[in-house]
């Protein structure tokens, strides 16, 4: 299900649908998202994949009361560690690597609010380091100890 579809089926009146570009750097996108959401709230955040990393970082800047992340690589991506050399012009690979600044700073964020990570477990690709959903390893999705995990037999998408 897409977020747009869910939006048509709910009666929420204060949701903020934020889009960002993977061609922009992480912190440029984070600044844009924070600006769109400031002076509103409290916020319950939902993010898929890299969007979950943005959602986690938003807890530092907004009054976030809870969150759901879906297939988020909280430990980063070993694939991105080498892919950034193959496609150096694509900022996403530099931002989601295991030693990238957004991932390292995410390790410093300690959650004290309800948070659920939905872990997708189907769709393995052989060149990732370990079991994965076709994009993110299960180890990266389950790296944090301060959230609840729900496993679903589904691919990353």
Question: What is each model feature region?
Answer:
Residues 15, 23-112, 125, 133:
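Serine-dependent carboxylesterase/thioesterase catalytic core
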Residues 109-157:
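C-terminal catalytic-base region of ester-bond hydrolases, centering on the histidine
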Residues 11, 62-63, 143-145:
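Short, structured coil segments at secondary-structure junctions
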Residues 20:
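Hydrophobic pocket-lining residues within nucleotide cofactor-binding pockets
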Residues 1-17:
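Short, surface-exposed "cap/lid" segments of acyl-processing enzymes
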Residues 1, 49, 120:
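Glycine-rich His-Gly loop
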């Amino acid at each position: 299900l897409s977020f747009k579809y869910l939006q048509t089926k709910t009666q929420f009146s204060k949701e903020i649908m934020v889009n960002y570009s993977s061609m922009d750097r992480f912190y440029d996108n984070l600044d844009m998202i924070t600006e769109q959401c400031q002076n509103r709230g409290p916020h319950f955040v939902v993010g898929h994949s890299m969007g979950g990393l943005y959602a986690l970082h938003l807890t530092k800047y907004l009054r976030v009361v809870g969150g759901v992340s879906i297939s988020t690589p909280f430990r980063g991506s070993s694939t991105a560690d080498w892919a950034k050399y193959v496609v150096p012009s694509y900022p996403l690979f530099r931002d989601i690597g295991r030693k990238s600044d957004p991932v390292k700073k995410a390790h410093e964020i300690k959650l004290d609010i309800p948070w659920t990570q939905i872990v997708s477990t189907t769709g393995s690709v052989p060149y990732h380091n370990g079991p994965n959903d076709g994009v993110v390893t299960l180890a990266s999705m389950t790296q944090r100890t301060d959230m609840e995990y729900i496993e679903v037999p589904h691919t990353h998408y």
